[in-house]
């Protein structure tokens, strides 16, 4: 059963989507709180919120939008974008985020990331692994580091990281399908990793295919906004799996 995580990306207080992280491709879809309420009404339990202004400016910007969502919904929210300092992190948690994604900081200030992991626990810190051409990208995907994805994951998985949000940048917003091989390779190497696949989802079938290869969770955004995802079908599939697993566990041999 794959965890379904709709995404809300925010620029200037509005819900938007980009293509391959290019801010010039911005498409506005409305008010973040309205979208969050819509996802909750559909039966979603989790929400991925990205402060794109924050990612670009290197500090959290859209904290009010986050607070509005956590105040007016019961969604479990993970938040990312511009979280670079202890104050940024504390503001995100104070605004109601249950989990915070930290990616760039794990490249630029590894000791700070590790201190957050120790202080808040692996259940509340998500390692953001945004990858382009095999290298980890930082600062809203505007810069490529010289760190290979496999080295990045190896270091922080050994340090106790459990949650990893991996985005294949070349796929993001294209609706052309996720990086199946990349995610499968990560899961084979780190079977205990709670991997959140992100980027390229273009249909309900893409999500079902990720589920079939054992990916624990998926973030989707543009595909939903463009009417390509049937959330009711996905929830029905998950509920059927829960029911089937329950029957299997209850069977006496």
What is each residue range found by the language model?
Residues 19, 133-145, 174-177, 185, ...:
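Active-site-adjacent loop and "lid" segments of alpha/beta metabolic enzymes
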Residues 3-7, 46, 74-78, 98-101, ...:
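Structural preference for beta-strand elements that scaffold enzyme active sites
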Residues 22-40:
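Short catalytic helix/loop segments, enriched in acidic residues and glycine
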Residues 4, 54-70, 84-90, 104-126, ...:
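Active-site-adjacent beta->alpha loops and helix N-cap segments on the catalytic face
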Residues 40-43, 93-94, 157, 211:
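Non-catalytic positions within long, well-ordered alpha-helices that form the structural scaffold/packing
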Residues 112-120, 211-212, 217-220, 224-242, ...:
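C-terminal helical cap(s) of enzyme catalytic domains, especially alpha/beta-barrels
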Residues 12-13, 17-23, 98-172:
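Conserved anion-binding
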Residues 73, 77-99, 181-217:
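Catalytic cores of alpha/beta
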